[in-house]
């Protein structure tokens, strides 16, 4: 059983005092009870060059008569063992909307997907990242249904606002009303709903909410999670009259989660998901020891898209050259694609407004859709909805397929070259086209990037070695295997960004273990002043990169 050391107790009490004032000692007592009932875990933590995570839904692959989690595990084990060290399994809990992110019950597995046993089996062979959807619950959840019945236990679980309250300073991530009216026996109540009327925000000013969420966090750890993704964590603490984004209360809650995990499961890593400009994003590292160990690298996808749109890596290189980590116990979670669209807000301050507008135009020209958010100046684009393959190459153009594949792989070599742990969305393994049928059927733009496969459909694609899916899966698997063998790609290995325009030039590692990473971001051959062995091809590199070719060079 786990217990808190005097030092941990004092640190926890300090943060609880900030959040709850004189109630803090009582909350600490409850927290100690929760921790004392948790079996102490001491496993290997940290990270290495061997780490890469696949991002996928639990029902990504369907086979008739088989729970999707078992079908997924079979695919992971047969195709990707030794390629990926871990899996980010998107929310696998009962949910009513938002493809899993309107959670009904934090501590149950959706029976349509499988069971906790299926989750634990995946976690035995792959390092599991689970989502803690910490900002909100489904309007159909027992908590909110209790609130709607005026159950005293749940009256403080949600945020209600009086009519006429000035909320003009609140940051809005969506072009939807912030408040949703609900009828209760005691009358109509205006409830805070940041993301949608079906996603009711939790009230962390009530310590009971914090304790329930920490119980959910430990449930995931108990069932094998080695990483916890803190979904939309920047929104969790509200103070009227502020932006209600990235407030000190949110950071205190992350610090509390870190302290609890340090006490009971120090191998578990926190990953903050804050789709925000870089400065706010990296604030969730805290001092490098007291908040999240990993932070999502949200500027990377729009910057890579800009790089290949212009054939110029200078903006990407300039941004990457300024990246620093506060300690060796932190690193970046790098990604180019995920279940969401390509967010353009994080590129603000790096790209000019007209450059962001050009990305929006390209997405539309390539068959994508654009989601907007509300601002005082009206709706503005925040997300481009289409697959990464289609974002980089126009699916309607007569450009050669092999050139499109080369461009796509070059973009992903950038992902694998940069300092951090790479997360690879499952559709990036196949170069999937946008799912227009899924969008038309649902009306949900993000469904363009969320196609679910039947097992037979996927196997048919991969059985043809000349297919796009087979070519990209083979190439990507090779890249990840090569990467895992070289300490220069350790998430904390040194990184130098060299002057870059048509070729992105990165040096990882140092001394005789250094690797020069060169990625041609144009459709023309480029010359680089470096020769040596190309780890990707296994052949001697003589200094000329073909269009969209990448090379990892050692002396």
UniProtKB/Swiss-Prot annotation:
<dbReference type="InterPro" id="IPR033746">
    <property type="entry name" value="GGa_phosphorylase"/>
</dbReference>
<keyword id="KW-0808">Transferase</keyword>
<dbReference type="InterPro" id="IPR016377">
    <property type="entry name" value="Sucrose_GGa_phosphorylase-rel"/>
</dbReference>
<protein>
    <recommendedName>
        <fullName>Glucosylglycerate phosphorylase</fullName>
        <ecNumber>2.4.1.352</ecNumber>
    </recommendedName>
</protein>
<keyword id="KW-0328">Glycosyltransferase</keyword>
<comment type="similarity">
    <text>Belongs to the glycosyl hydrolase 13 family. Glucosylglycerate phosphorylase subfamily.</text>
</comment>
<dbReference type="InterPro" id="IPR017853">
    <property type="entry name" value="Glycoside_hydrolase_SF"/>
</dbReference>
<dbReference type="InterPro" id="IPR006047">
    <property type="entry name" value="Glyco_hydro_13_cat_dom"/>
</dbReference>
<dbReference type="Pfam" id="PF00128">
    <property type="entry name" value="Alpha-amylase"/>
</dbReference>
<comment type="function">
    <text>Catalyzes the reversible phosphorolysis of glucosylglycerate into alpha-D-glucose 1-phosphate (Glc1P) and D-glycerate. May be a regulator of intracellular levels of glucosylglycerate, a compatible solute that primarily protects organisms facing salt stress and very specific nutritional constraints. Has a very strict substrate specificity. Cannot catalyze the phosphorolysis of sucrose or synthesize sucrose from Glc1P and D-fructose.</text>
</comment>
<dbReference type="GO" id="GO:0005975">
    <property type="term" value="P:carbohydrate metabolic process"/>
</dbReference>
<keyword id="KW-0119">Carbohydrate metabolism</keyword>
<dbReference type="GO" id="GO:0016757">
    <property type="term" value="F:glycosyltransferase activity"/>
</dbReference>
<feature type="active site" description="Nucleophile">
    <location>
        <position position="231"/>
    </location>
</feature>
<dbReference type="InterPro" id="IPR045857">
    <property type="entry name" value="O16G_dom_2"/>
</dbReference>
């Amino acid at each position: 059983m786990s217990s808190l050391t005097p030092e941990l107790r004092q640190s926890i009490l300090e943060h609880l005092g900030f959040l709850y004032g004189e109630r803090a000692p009582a909350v600490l007592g409850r927290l100690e009870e929760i921790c004392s009932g948790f079996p102490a875990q001491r496993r290997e933590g940290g990270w290495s060059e061997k780490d890469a995570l696949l991002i996928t839904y639990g029902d990504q692959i369907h086979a008739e008569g088989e729970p999707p989690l078992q079908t997924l595990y079979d695919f992971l084990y047969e195709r990707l063992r030794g390629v990926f060290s871990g899996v980010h399994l998107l929310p696998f809990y009962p949910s009513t909307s938002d493809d899993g992110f309107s959670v009904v019950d934090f501590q149950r597995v959706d029976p349509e997907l499988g069971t906790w046993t299926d989750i634990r089996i995946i976690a035995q062979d792959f390092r599991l990242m689970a989502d803690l959807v910490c900002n909100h619950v489904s309007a159909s959840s027992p908590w909110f249904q209790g609130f709607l019945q005026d159950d005293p236990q749940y009256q403080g679980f949600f945020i209600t606002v009086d009519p006429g309250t000035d909320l003009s300073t609140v940051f809005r991530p969506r072009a939807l009303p912030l408040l949703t009216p609900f009828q209760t026996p005691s009358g109509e109540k205006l409830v805070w709903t940041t993301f949608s009327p079906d996603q009711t925000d939790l009230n962390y000013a009530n310590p009971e909410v914090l304790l329930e969420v920490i119980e959910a966090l430990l449930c995931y750890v108990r069932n094998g999670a080695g990483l916890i993704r803190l979904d939309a964590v920047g929104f969790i603490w509200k103070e009227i009259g502020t932006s209600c984004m990235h407030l000190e209360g949110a950071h205190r809650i992350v610090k509390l989660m870190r302290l609890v995990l340090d006490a009971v499961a120090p191998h578990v890593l926190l990953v903050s998901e804050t789709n925000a400009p870089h400065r706010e994003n990296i604030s969730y590292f805290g001092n490098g020891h007291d908040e999240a160990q990993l932070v999502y690298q949200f500027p990377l996808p729009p910057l890579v898209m800009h790089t290949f749109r212009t054939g110029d890596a200078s903006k990407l290189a300039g941004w990457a050259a300024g990246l620093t980590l506060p300690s060796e116990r932190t690193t970046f979670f790098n990604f180019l694609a995920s279940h969401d669209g390509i967010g353009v807000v994080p590129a603000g301050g790096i790209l000019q407004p007209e450059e962001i507008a050009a990305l929006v135009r390209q997405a539309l020209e390539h068959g994508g859709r654009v989601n907007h958010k509300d601002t005082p100046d009206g709706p503005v684009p925040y997300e481009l909805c289409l697959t990464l393959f289609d974002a980089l190459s126009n699916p309607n153009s007569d450009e050669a397929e092999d050139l499109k594949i080369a461009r796509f792989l070059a973009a992903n070599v950038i992902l694998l070259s940069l300092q951090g742990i790479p997360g690879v969305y499952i559709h990036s393994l196949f170069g999937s086209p946008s799912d227009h049928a899924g969008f038309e059927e649902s009306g949900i733009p993000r469904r363009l990037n969320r196609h679910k496969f039947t097992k037979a459909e996927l196997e048919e694609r991969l059985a043809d070695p000349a297919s796009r899916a087979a070519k990209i899966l083979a190439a990507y698997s090779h890249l990840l295997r090569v990467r895992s063998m070289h300490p220069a790609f350790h998430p904390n290995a040194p990184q130098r960004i060299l002057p870059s325009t048509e070729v992105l030039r990165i040096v990882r590692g140092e001394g005789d273990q250094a690797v020069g990473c060169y990625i041609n971001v144009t459709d023309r051959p480029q010359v680089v002043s470096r020769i040596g062995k190309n780890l990707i091809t296994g052949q001697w590199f003589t200094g000329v990169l073909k269009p969209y070719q990448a090379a990892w060079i050692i002396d």
